[in-house]
Amino acid sequence: MNELKNMIKGRLWLPGDAGFDEARTPWNLSVDQPVAAVVEAAGADDVAATVGHAALHGLTVTTQASGHGAVTAEGVILLRTHLMDTVEIADGVARAGAGAKWGQVLSAAGPLGLTGVAGSSPVVSVTGYTLGGGLGWFSRKYGFASASVLAADVVDATGARVRVTAESDPELFWALRGGGGDFAVVTGLEFALSPAPVLYGGRMMWPAERAPEVLAAFREVTAGAPEELTVWFDLLKFPGAPGLVAVDCTYLGEDPGELLRPFDAIGGAIGDTRAVLPVADLGSICAEPTDPTPSAGRVELLTGLDDAVAAALLADPIDPLFNVQVRHLGGALTRPSGGAAGELTEPYLLYMVGPAMPGTAERMDVLSKALVPHTSGRKPYTMLHSGEQAASAFDAGTLARLRDLKRARDPHGVLRANYPVLGTA
């Protein structure tokens, strides 16, 4: 490793070094990563040097910016790209370094009347999120975030720096748009931004006992919602606090008018933050933690939201989970994305999250099993969690195509995504 240390401008940590444990710790503090070394890349040349060194010496590299999707990574070189966080916007196109976060992109794009297909958190890395497809607030209107990718600057499994477009390498370009990080290390992404001249959004909140009414209104609103409107239903329970039910929404426009009227008719709301807001404030709607936390989560895709599903969701308290959320999908997501992400025909997504403690997995198991007749079995790659496999994110044809590409481009397994397309995570 001393050879690698002399090749890079960034930092290298080895086990026993001061700062090693901090450097190897991902955003999800419940995940342990007993890696062989950590490289903090100062730029694309450091990425190339690290991958080239690994290829030469039979080592494996796992790349993370923030580590939101991290899983246990044993014996690998952990390549940190968080310092590569530049964001540039010109002519409706954003260029984001491998470590750039969505909050940076939205802050730069919003004043121009533009947005990217960002998720609920401003501190998630653009690259990791987009490589996995990227399922966010505006996906009903604009599809997967990966569908907006125009070009990627990458380091391949030999350590060579390459620019990838639909014309230069159509197969790799296809894979990078939703197939994960198994095929190359992305050092920069270029993607088209989408119009958002005015954004309306916020959260409505009620005591937990109003959950049946709120869920009924959610079913009514989402049954006929235009693609500009996205609504999420939340059951919330935090330690030491009473249970709550909430609805989060965004609307690409100034006023959704009657579209949200069924929620207003419920009455008894104890909070309502709905307003026209800057694109840069998108993360304030859900107000998710922006500091590292230990947590466990799971996602299921729902084939519908009929009375049986509603009854299962409301049957029991959600403790010890923090949040049981149902997201409305549909719209542009049902149409082909042009990349490995494909399309999502399921109309709703169930997201469960809780503390990394005994009882959390069991509670998620109970709800997942109750909903088995109403789930498709597929999971979006961008929302896989520890213990799950990439195979569950793709249909058989897409998975076979990704595996063929992996074997052809990285036959020695130099690169390893959090959820590898070959084998298990």
Residue map of PLM features:
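Soluble FAD-dependent oxygen oxidases
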Residues: 1-425
